[in-house]
Amino acid sequence: MLPIILSAGPVTLYTYGFLLAVGVFLESFIIWRRLRDLGLKEEKVIDFILLGLLLGLFFSRLIFIVQNFSYFGWHPLNWLLFVHYPGLASLGWWLGIFVSLWRFVKVEKWDFWRTADEITFGLFPFLILLQLGSFLDGSGFGRSTNMFWGIYFPGILLKRHPLSLLSASSLFVIWFFLIKIERHWRVWEWYKSKESGFIALTALGLIFLINIPLAFIREAKVYLYLAQIALNFIAFIFILILFYLRSGRSLKKGYEKQKDSKTS
């Protein structure tokens, strides 16, 4: 583990805080550049980014506290001390960004799905660095394990699943996959509508899917981790349904086409 990058006299540079700052910068820059290229007003883009960061910080911290309530307890001061009690939930950050986006869609008449696709590419560098920071500072561990990938974390006697490292690796694979398909998905025949939203829905669907097995190794009380599994599964199914509805395909048309081929 590497909780501290640099310590010189009264100055201490924490790994988690440093990677968090780098992630915020990369996210803001990528989103700003992509939305500017869409032709959106630059001052409105900056307002959107600032609101998204504030809401993302709030929701991600809130969800992380709920997920790890046995660690935080009823101590509001611990909830606010990011350095001594670090941790943010990736899905909370997504929620904050998309609440901000919804506000600008209503007020500024932005195209929701087209903007969401562009924003998605900016979120992943932040989320990856966030999970990597949790791993390096020793807070991103899961349940105890005897498997070969188990790691000893500071202050813990038993090997634990490197939960944050697994999350960071999964997010990197998803991000790489989205970059590879960005210029190709519109020519895929099975996605008939060619409508925007493909990238954002793919990202969310894969994240919910990966969160299901990760929930099994998360350190939480039984009712909490069962709730996480159920909620992620429901969210994944919802994304699949939404994906299908936006794809331009129809079960009714497919059935009629199959029926006509049999009668001819």
Locate the predicted segments by residue:
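Hydrophobic, membrane-interfacing alpha helices
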Residues: M1-S264
